[in-house]
Amino acid sequence: MPGVNSEPLRLSDIYGQGYDCFIKDKSQFEVIKGGRASKKSASMALRTIMRIMQYPDANMLVVRRVYGTLKDSCFANLLWAIDRLGVTKRWKVNTNPLLLTYIPTGQQIIFRGLDDPLKLTSITVRRGKLCWVWVEEAYEVTDPEAFRKLEMSIRGMLPPGLFKQFTLTFNPWRENWIKERFWDNSEEDVFL
């Protein structure tokens, strides 16, 4: 099976050309904007599943402003990606609470909402390290302080070969703290 201790899976083989830079990116921050049907969420879901299978000590946190919106958005996209990649039997799916577990290693994709900030503190994974955060519909996060607190969810040093990454996906906007931080005044390690 591709991606499991063999040749890496390639998004371009599954989803079309033009995604290689996105797939390979290891910037600390990725800021991905696009209109409806731009494939940003589907591409992110495919990459997430592939990365979990390729990095056996990595785990991911998936966030939206409201926890209740995750099931029909990110969670559904990740289930689609698992099916599309043909690895359904390798994943355990929990719907209450939302949780995806990669069975061969015990790695997790954890889901949280910013509407319950206490559930964002002290997130612990069963195996490895929490390395990556995906913030879907990031424009809904209207308070930059909420994002700063989210950044604290990935703490400490990571073992060699792993990297910290925050990916913000959203539809285009006019005025938002995201534009100011990552486009207008950024000196951070950002993939735009």
Predicted regions mapped to residue ranges:
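Phosphate/NTP-binding elements of NTP-utilizing enzymes
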Residues: M1-L192
